């Protein structure tokens, strides 16, 4: 299956590209600069120009599925967060609807429905992500929204905890590796039981395959 990845050049996005190729999919990396091809093409990706703050039809054309793994970054202010994590995500969703990329897996965030569960410094981010999530849920696409806790760069454990609300969040208790998150994003593509599901995830004791089957 041809799968376009928004945020392909990010730390999580690169892992997603590799895992898609390993699983037999055809990953399409949406990038803002063709210079990034040198690092992404060896991961098995076709690279296409696309910027979430501009029309992205070219990047999505011919793809049957999409994974949204983009983000404005933790060092940006509320305005950039709204431009990328909210408006950019919504425009990308609309493009997928228009171009019939019916399967959509969203990398969301823990605590977006209840920002008070997290630090006040992230409330603007939670609110922006919540708006984008609701837009996806109303889009008619076959969506899955994965809401991980704090992302780490450690090797994946292959085991997670999932739930609708995993309680007040802290880095010490609500973290998860990027590798495990990428695995969940990719595996959800072919799991029909995850369609129209929204769930939080952190590191845990349940093997990823078992956790996803139980959703």
Can you annotate each of these PLM segments?
Residues 70, 105-108, 149, 202:
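Active-site beta-alpha turn of Rossmann-fold NAD(P)-dependent dehydrogenases/reductases
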Residues 29-91, 95-98, 113, 189-193, ...:
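NAD(P)H-binding glycine-rich loop region in Rossmannoid oxidoreductase-like domains
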Residues 12, 66, 146, 181-185, ...:
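Non-catalytic, hydrophobic alpha-helical segments
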Residues 31, 147-152:
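Conserved SDR Rossmann-fold cofactor-binding beta-strand/turn motif
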Residues 2, 64-65, 103:
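Structural motif
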Residues 6, 11, 26-30, 34, ...:
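Conserved Rossmann-fold NAD(P)-dependent oxidoreductase catalytic core, especially the SDR/UDP-sugar
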Residues 1-25:
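N-terminal Rossmann NAD(P)H-binding glycine-rich loop of SDR-like oxidoreductase domains
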Residues 153-156, 160-215:
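Active-site-lining helix/loop region of Rossmann-like oxidoreductase modules
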């Amino acid at each position: 299956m041809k799968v376009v990845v928004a945020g392909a050049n990010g730390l999580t996005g690169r892992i997603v590209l590799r895992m898609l190729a390993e699983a037999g999919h055809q990953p399409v990396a949406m990038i803002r600069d063709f210079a990034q091809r040198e690092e992404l093409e060896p991961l098995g990706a076709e690279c296409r120009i696309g910027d979430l703050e501009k029309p992205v039809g070219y990047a999505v054309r011919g793809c049957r599925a999409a994974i949204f793994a983009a983000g404005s970054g933790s060092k940006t202010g509320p305005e950039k967060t709204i431009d990328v994590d909210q408006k950019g995500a919504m425009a990308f969703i609309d493009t997928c609807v228009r171009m019939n990329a019916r399967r959509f897996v969203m990398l969301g965030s823990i605590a977006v429905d209840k920002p008070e569960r997290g630090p006040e410094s992230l409330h603007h981010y939670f609110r922006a992500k919540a708006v984008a999530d609701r837009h996806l849920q109303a889009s008619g696409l076959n969506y899955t929204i994965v809401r991980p806790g704090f992302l780490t760069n450690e090797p994946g454990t292959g085991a997670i905890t999932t739930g609708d609300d995993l309680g007040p969040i802290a880095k010490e208790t609500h973290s998860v590796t990027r590798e495990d998150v990428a695995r969940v994003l990719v595996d959800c593509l072919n799991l029909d039981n995850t369609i129209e599901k929204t769930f939080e995830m952190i590191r845990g004791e349940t093997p990823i395959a078992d956790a996803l089957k139980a959703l």
